[in-house]
């Protein structure tokens, strides 16, 4: 557990006003992002069968919450970590065409999360996925889509200002693009997360590209990424510099998804070739899955950003250690 406590924190809104702002942001943003990216809202599972291989393995070390059910003896059911692979499967199952996509309200439990101002064991995000052509699996496509997502986030600043002018946090006017290798070359002495802090403070908002593969200097990845959804050469995180806490705030991870070649190479690099026998992976390697781009946009993180909140627990209901709750109460941080 770690906690940043800002000096003289003013939440600006009461808890009930905050709840109204959360409702407004969530309802407005999902409509706006759906229109911008041509996405249809779809119902999504909260749990999947382990045997399908559809759950997100995240960094490969976090264990999902799992259980068994009476009518499926011998099958382990897992609470989702995210819907990264399920969405691609759903696009195929429901017959989505080129440049059509879906978004879901995804709720997950990540029981092994390290808790801090931004991280909770409860995860809520808009998970989205869109069909693209194979020839569109390019950096240009990725950057254009990142700019579309940023445009909607920036527009939300104005929407929130109109309704809650006393609370809105002002965002930069543009997003910049950097690579993880470029950051390592510039600051080899810093850790990857320290590099993100540096570049976010310098530029205001950045898309940090190419996450998952080993960097040239250190021989270590910038950050962990599962090998079976993002193409590590065509992905990244949208990160804002967040003045209230004097640190970076990641709002979205997204990327162009693996094709057959990238899946095979990344499974080998991750020493996870056994996954190739799972139904999802088998279909993808056989060329039976659509080519897609997709990502997740944190709902609580976005509310926190737009309202200038000091803790994610001010915009979502979760469980926190007593020590954290006491420190927040002293600092006027109103946990729900």
UniProtKB/Swiss-Prot annotation:
Chief location: cytoplasm
Subcellular location: Cytoplasm
Pathway(s) served: Amino-acid biosynthesis; L-asparagine biosynthesis; L-asparagine from L-aspartate (ammonia route): step 1/1
CDD domains: AsnA (cd00645)
Enzyme Commission (EC) number: 6.3.1.1
Keyword annotations of the record: Amino-acid biosynthesis, Asparagine biosynthesis, ATP-binding, Cytoplasm, Ligase, Nucleotide-binding
Coiled-coil parts of chain: none
SUPFAM superfamilies recorded: Class II aaRS and biotin synthetases
Alphabetical list of NCBIfam families matching this protein: asnA (TIGR00669)
Protein name from the UniProt record: Aspartate--ammonia ligase
Species this protein is from: Limosilactobacillus fermentum (strain NBRC 3956 / LMG 18251) (Lactobacillus fermentum)
Gene (name only): asnA
